[in-house]
Amino acid sequence: MTNIIELPEVLANQIAAGEVVERPASVVKELVENAIDAKSSQITVEIEESGLKMIQVTDNGEGMSHEDLPLSLRRHATSKIKSQSDLFRIRTLGFRGEALPSVASISKITIKTATKEVTHGSLLIATGGEIETLEAISTPTGTKIKVENLFYNTPARLKYMKSLQAELAHIVDVVNRLSLAHPEVAFTLISDGRQLTQTSGTGDLRQAIAGIYGLNTTKKMLAISNADLDFEVSGYVSLPELTRANRNYMTILVNGRYIKNFLLNRAILDGYGSKLMVGRFPIVVIDIQIDPYLADVNVHPTKQEVRISKERELMALISTAISESLKEQDLIPDALENLAKSSTRHFSKPEQTQLPLQSRGLYYDPQKNDFFVKESAVSEKIPETDFYFGTVDNSVKVEKAELLPHSEEVIGPSSVKHASRPQNTFTETDHPNLDLKNRQKLSQMLTRLENEEQSVFPELDYFGQMHGTYLFAQGKDGLFIIDQHAAQERVKYEYYRDKIGEVDSSLQQLLVPYLFEFSGSDFINLQEKMALLNEVGIFLEVYGHNTFILREHPIWMKEEEIASGVYEMCDMLLLTNEVSIKTYRAELAIMMSCKRSIKANHSLDDYSARNLLLQLAQCQNPYNCPHGRPVLINFSKADMEKMFRRIQENHTSLRELGKY
């Protein structure tokens, strides 16, 4: 009796499903790719309960004949390749003949299909890979595939499913990538009766980007183009000012197929050069047309890994295309555009009685080492002086008075602000080792910050600055050199750390709400994690397609920081994914303190420099920035005398120093 047996086909398909079908999004990907290969111009994806209950993909493609329909559930049965040579010139998205049998083996599947050559269509129903019904029906040209009760016979796979919102976000991401890869196809995604994605199918990639990432994002995208004898590169890349906290927005397409490739990602970043800050990544959609002989897609059943010949030449082509496109642009932000963002629209003012105003300001008390709110009457126009750097001026500015006619709660386009992403002010030279994705380093950093003890700061007398970066001061212990960025970062960190923890009752209503726009997958993920944002005083409400509205903000957040601050917090939440409130607040304080601090090569006047040293003296730990870098160094009088050889070393002193 032999010990080796040939596995039944259904069991073999279930094993194959372990690689091909990881989650509901995998099913959507395989079915939609089949629809694209069938030359469809319209594809509709409908799901229920994030695909676990039902996934239905309808297309208007070529369809299948009555004879071919049952063969589609046979393993390694395909119409896309017929010989070994075809394997090296693949132009379709599918070719292995594994996807549909694998899906059918772990679900109940219903297929309705018809070709334009016949007067009737066909219906197939299968459960667990076993065909139960095969009959002729009347149905439009094309194919409709319904997958129900996914993983019903593989309960172990269900244990590893994330929340419904997380699985839905994966599906949205898959449809978005395929929409970008095939702008000539009109895609519609409907979840539990609600439309999440819709593209026009005009063939215009820029229009597809607008449908997925929003019009505001598309306006800041540049077209790129480059080619040689082997490759043709085209697409769109974002301006350096428009970035995200991870690589999820970098889409690389090879012959209409979305792929993952580390070296090509690096080529994209190389094209930006020093224009990108550390830890930030651009929004990119790059389409690469390549001779199929130069690309091997038969690497993994998911077909997302592709081996490319002449990869180094392709990298250089991509980098050059991006750098040349950026050179042609004026990367200096438009001052008038920024001014317009900070101003509000004007309306006719109704007659009103002059009333005394109450101004609420947040002030710092150096005696109590704490902040307090003070109200004061304002009789005339409130001065809008905003010193770049004075005493710890974190006053909450009143929204510029905008008298709106009395209206209902409904907010129209004229009474909201569209929030813009923050500009890149954080450079690699500031903190080259800061990586929010490295959870171990972050944990060590936060533990060190929590265990800091109150330090005694020396009394310093400021007398100068060098290269707009270092401050010089003297004290009884000699010469002190202070890194101005690290110093203010420490001051800002302790401020944000304290104030972020006091958000329960410190909210201020906005006269003009802000709108925040996200991609479909990020929008869904943020909805699931909204409670974490609420913990730090950010209350976002759903407002239209992939958009949130902010009606109030925490009092520790300045008016000019609202748009950038909220986006930064959302990016951090999406990046770190699972994070405790305590860690979330600490990470937020670290990041915001760095972004809000003065940078190198910025000259300070004597008043501002002395104020910085006074604030530093009030800190719990004035000697290190939140990332652990030293804030100041000290040269004692003896050190200075040794450097100028006023003190001669002897054998004993050298031996004590371990140098002899």
Swiss-Prot record:
GO terms for molecular function: ATP binding; ATP hydrolysis activity; ATP-dependent DNA damage sensor activity; mismatched DNA binding. SMART domains: DNA_mis_repair (SM01340), MutL_C (SM00853). GO terms for cellular component: mismatch repair complex. One of its GO terms (biological process) is mismatch repair. Keywords: DNA damage, DNA repair. HAMAP family: DNA_mis_repair (MF_00149). PANTHER family: DNA MISMATCH REPAIR PROTEIN MLH, PMS, MUTL, DNA MISMATCH REPAIR PROTEIN MLH1. This is DNA mismatch repair protein MutL.
